[in-house]
Amino acid sequence: MDLLQFLAAFSVLLWPGTEVTGALKSTLDPSLKIYKKMFEVKRREQLLALKNLAQLNDIHQQYKILDVMLKGLFKVLEDSRTVLIAADVLPDGPVPQDEKLKDAFSHVVENTAFFGDVVLRFPKIVHHYFDHNSNWNLLIRWGISFCNQTGVFDQGPHSPILSLMAQELGITEKDSDFRNPFKTDQTEFIPSTDPFQKALREEEKRRKKEERRKEIRKGPRISRSQSEL
């Protein structure tokens, strides 16, 4: 699977399927029970996509895919947060029935969980971005808090994801027995000679160079006659 196919697959994962929102019904909130079943389906899709990404064994490709995917994920999260706050949707209330609000609710829950998966499976790449982005930090703190109150993550196989993510990112203090289940290297500091870090630096330099070239091309052009004046 090439880069474009991967990006197309991940972009679909950032948005909830219409079958999820269409199936929700409320009566003393059985909608939550129904949503949790649909959430399970979405989670299987997300985890399969990440498994395929991990099997690429190409740091540069993984970097490019996660670069695009993370930016898209946080844009969706930010837009959905705005919608929910504007409508005074409470996370511990019933699952919203308005189509727009249901979508926003699903976006927050599913993308927060998905980001947790990415954090735990690709911690070095995520820290490379996240640790210097205060806006992402604020958004994911809000997302974790929102999700913790929805009841979606109560019990079940996905209940630990929010806590593990918060500890890995340093949002909450690490438990004495904390261990990222997907991290093979448990050292606190990554040596500068680490080949992964080297690849990240090279990719970052290449990306910045490309951005500078684009800026130069966009800049105003001075004609020869103007430059001679």
Curated annotation (Swiss-Prot):
Primary localisation category: endoplasmic reticulum
Keyword list, A-Z: Coiled coil, Cytoplasm, Endoplasmic reticulum, Glycoprotein, Nucleus, Secreted, Signal
Molecular function GO labels: protein-macromolecule adaptor activity
InterPro entries referenced in this protein's UniProt entry, alphabetically: Coiled-coil_dom_con_pro_134 (IPR026321)
PTM remark: O-glycosylated, with additional sialic acid modifications.
Xref: Pfam families: ERK-JNK_inhib
Family: Belongs to the CCDC134 family.
Intracellular or extracellular location(s): Endoplasmic reticulum lumen; Secreted; Cytoplasm; Nucleus
GO terms under cellular component: cytosol; endoplasmic reticulum lumen; extracellular region; nucleus
Disordered: region residues: 182-229
Role, per record: Molecular adapter required to prevent protein hyperglycosylation of HSP90B1: during translation, associates with nascent HSP90B1 and the STT3A catalytic component of the OST-A complex and tethers them to a specialized translocon that forms a microenvironment for HSP90B1 folding. In the CCDC134-containing translocon, STT3A associates with the SRT pseudosubstrate motif of HSP90B1, preventing access to facultative glycosylation sites until folding is completed, preventing hyperglycosylation and subsequent degradation of HSP90B1.
Signal peptide range in chain numbering: 1-22
Oligomeric form and interacting partners: Interacts with TADA2A. Associates with the PCAF complex via TADA2A binding.
Protein name, UniProt field: Coiled-coil domain-containing protein 134
Motif (Prevents secretion from ER): 226-229
